[in-house]
Amino acid sequence: MDDGEGWRLVAASASYKAFHAFAGHAFAELARGGMVPDAGALLASARALCGGEVDLVAVDMPLGHSPIVGRRASDNLVSRVYGGRKAGVHSPSAERPGALSDGLRAEFAALGYGLCTTELRTPGVIEVYPHPALIELTGLPLRLPYKAGKTLTYWPGLDRATRVSRLLDTWGMIVGYLEAALPGAGAALVVPTRPTKAFEDRLDAVVCALVAARALDGRVRALGDTDSAVWVPLAG
């Protein structure tokens, strides 16, 4: 949130349930089964945490004005721009994210938060892909090796202890960049002593929050078309 003194992170959670609980309200009871997002409940928890209305929602999931059944123009454009930096996009499908994406986009739209593609409008929703976002936020040349389940892919010739050490070091480096750009990120992202998917998910959530802040400051660009777009921060 920006209270007039610049952006700062108020809260970050690895799951919907944890986010609602962090708000300190009964909103945790509104989450549907933990894995299925509830747009109304998420907005209510966010309002409780920041003490005001929510201007922009950033989502780390393929979204589109029309049902997603395969690769989109936005996926092709992101891959064209960032594929050489190992941050291309995997193809979405009717199964993944499928109905989950369509339902979430429709829920937010019904609450007045339309999906932004060619221009930013508030209140609104934007799609974020953390890999290219981190490339631009850090200024590094390639996709950062920060996914907990891919250490063998990143460092195939190293033993597990060394791979874990490198992963934790990468997490620490990313947190440093995020804290410098969004105060409060460091407190929300205390690097664990062993890799956890929960930490990785919380890190992605903070990246999305920072991209949303940059968007509200006019420091992003949209890669896509009228149906879908991935919003990427400008370098620096």
Predicted regions and their residues:
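RNase H-like (RuvC/DEDD) metal-dependent nuclease/polynucleotide-processing core
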Residues: M1-G236
